[in-house]
């Protein structure tokens, strides 16, 4: 049985991106596999879109936090290198 996406790939994605990756993965699974999961039309659209948007918001917040930390570390390096 040849799978398009293996469980190993999904776990690697979740470990790399953390909670945002988990939310995005759940949203995509719900949107794509709604027939197999037995979820009716309005429910899978609502759950999938909420999960995807929550994951994207978390990803944006995490990226902004990383940028702020990176700039602060660069600023500290410049202060210490001038002394």
UniProtKB/Swiss-Prot annotation:
Q: Keywords in UniProt for this one?
A: Host-virus interaction
* General function of this protein: Plays a central role in the packaging of viral DNA into phage procapsid, which occurs in the late stage of infection. Can interact with the replicative complex after the completion of one round of DNA synthesis. When protein ORF5 is bound to the replicative form, the complex becomes accessible to procapsid and serves as a DNA packaging apparatus.
Family in the record: Belongs to the microviridae C protein family.
Q: What is this protein called?
A: Protein ORF5
């Amino acid at each position: 049985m040849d799978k398009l996406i293996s469980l190993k790939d999904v776990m690697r994605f979740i470990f790399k991106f953390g909670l945002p990756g988990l939310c995005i993965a759940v949203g995509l699974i719900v949107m794509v596999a709604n027939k197999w999961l037995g979820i009716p039309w309005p429910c899978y659209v609502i759950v999938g879109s909420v999960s995807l948007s929550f994951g994207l918001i978390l990803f944006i917040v995490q990226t902004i936090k990383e940028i702020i930390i990176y700039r602060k570390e660069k600023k500290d390096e410049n202060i210490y290198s001038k002394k």
